[in-house]
Amino acid sequence: MKKNAVVPFLVACVCYVLPLQAQIPDNHPIHLFQSYITGDFDNSRQIAQELQAGKQVHPYAKHVNRVANEKIDHLPNPLNGFFLLEESYYKYAEGDTIVKPYLFFFEALPEGKVKLYSMQLPKEIAPKDIRNDNPLLRFDYRTLQPSPTFRPAVYTQTERGFYLKAPNEFPGGVFTLEETIGKDRLEVMELLIREGRQITPYNMPIIYERINMTK
């Protein structure tokens, strides 16, 4: 979540569950999706363009995304998708760097789409330890649960990549995640509206570009 934004809560905490496991076909688009979303990305080009225009609008933002299956114990085999550990870093010119780790599960749907689940992070693991380069980091699949405050959402493949728009209502407002995951480029807009007022301090998505190859 960006600076000045507030993490929303849904009216009711619905219990979402991960899907039954199945073998993924070799030609399923999730394999292309995985290659697009895995790696290191930042919006340094976007920031440079904004500064050249006279005003920085977006925070500097960086994602460090890695497939996290090998960090999860008791993982089913076959697995109908993959886990991704995302390290998110955000910094406005006048503020400190905000660090946010996320664990996602992406499910291969039969019709060729990809379903996103945002997972709850175990409370016993300190956020500072949830890093891709932490060799001691372990999750237990048997205790992992999808977040009750983010409704699972579906990416549809388009000419530009994989597109998702996911509104989540909460008391007094709505949080909408809109993304396009493309080759070497991620477009991410997180729009928070509360009591009819826009909290997100910008109207256009953060444009991430790949800055190095996947490890």
Region roles according to the model:
Residues 46-79:
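N-terminal, post-signal-peptide region of Sec/Tat-exported proteins
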Residues 26, 63-71, 168-175:
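Charged, amphipathic alpha-helical segments
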